[in-house]
C-alpha cells in the first residue's frame, strides 16, 4: 500500500479519512472511461507487485507469534550449552570480530565469568525451551555501555532482532538508569544487524575501526 501511495495509485481510491461526496466519486468513475488512463493506472499498480506478498504475510505472522510467546530473562547456569551452540553458529562466528570456533572449555570459562561480572548484563530469549537469541550489554566508563546481539539460525529472517533489541534496551534502562549512552559495533558487511540497530533508533557514529560501523 505504501508503494502504491508513493506512485499515486491508491490516493484517490482508498482514502478512508476523506469526506467523500457523490460528485467526487462520479469524477473518479468517469476517468476510467478513458482507455489511456486505465492503462496508466494499471501500469502504476503492477509496477509495485513482486509476487512476494504471501511470503511477507507469512513472515509477519511468524514474527508476531514469537513476539507474543517469547520470554526474556538474565542468563543463568542452565543457559551454558544453548549459548555455546549459538556462539558457534556459522553466521554468528562470521559476524563476530573474533571468527575462530569457540571450544567448550573456552566458552565455559567465559560464561561463568560473565555471570559474575557486575559490569555485564546478558539477556536470553526463549520460546518455550528453545533459545531464540541473546542481547549483551558491557558497561564501560563514563556511564556508557556496548550492546551486541545474536539470533539462532531458525529464527532469522523474521525481523525478530528489533523485538529483542527493544525488549533488552527497555529492561536494561530500567535497571541501569545511570547509563546515558549505548554503542553498538557492527561489521560493515553485516547488513541485517545494521538495519536492526537503525530501526531500534541507533544512528551512525564515527568509528576508529575500519572494519566496523559504530552506532549510538
What residue spans do the PLM features occupy?
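Nucleotide-activated sugar donor-binding and catalytic core shared by glycosyltransferases
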Residues: 1-66
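Acyl-donor (CoA/ACP) binding surface of acyl/acetyltransferases
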Residues: 69-75, 80-82, 86-87, 128-216
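Conserved GNAT-fold acetyl-CoA-binding loop/helix
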Residues: 91-109
Amino acid at each position: 500500500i505504501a508503494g502504491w501511495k508513493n506512485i499515486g495509485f491508491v490516493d484517490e481510491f482508498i482514502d478512508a479519512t476523506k469526506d467523500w461526496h457523490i460528485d467526487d466519486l462520479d469524477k473518479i468513475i468517469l476517468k476510467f472511461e478513458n482507455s489511456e488512463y486505465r492503462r496508466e493506472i494499471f501500469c502504476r499498480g503492477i509496477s509495485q507487485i513482486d509476487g512476494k506478498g504471501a511470503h511477507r504475510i507469512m513472515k509477519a505472522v511468524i514474527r508476531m507469534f514469537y513476539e507474543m510467546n517469547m520470554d526474556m530473562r538474565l542468563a543463568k547456569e542452565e543457559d551454558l550449552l544453548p549459548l555455546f551452540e549459538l556462539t558457534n553458529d556459522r553466521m554468528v562466528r562470521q559476524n563476530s570480530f573474533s571468527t575462530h570456533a569457540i571450544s567448550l572449555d573456552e566458552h565455559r570459562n567465559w560464561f561463568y565469568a560473565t555471570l559474575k561480572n557486575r559490569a555485564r548484563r546478558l539477556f536470553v530469549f526463549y520460546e518455550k525451551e528453545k533459545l531464540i537469541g541473546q542481547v549483551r550489554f558491557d558497561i564501560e566508563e563514563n556511564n556508557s555501555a556496548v550492546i551486541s546481539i545474536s539470533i539462532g539460525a531458525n529464527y532469522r529472517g523474521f525481523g525478530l532482532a528489533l523485538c529483542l533489541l527493544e525488549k533488552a534496551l527497555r529492561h536494561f534502562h530500567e535497571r541501569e538508569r545511570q547509563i546515558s549512552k549505548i554503542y553498538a559495533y557492527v561489521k560493515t558487511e553485516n547488513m541485517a544487524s545494521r538495519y536492526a540497530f537503525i530501526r531500534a533508533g541507533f544512528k551512525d557514529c564515527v568509528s576508529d575501526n575500519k572494519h566496523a560501523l559504530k552506532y549510538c
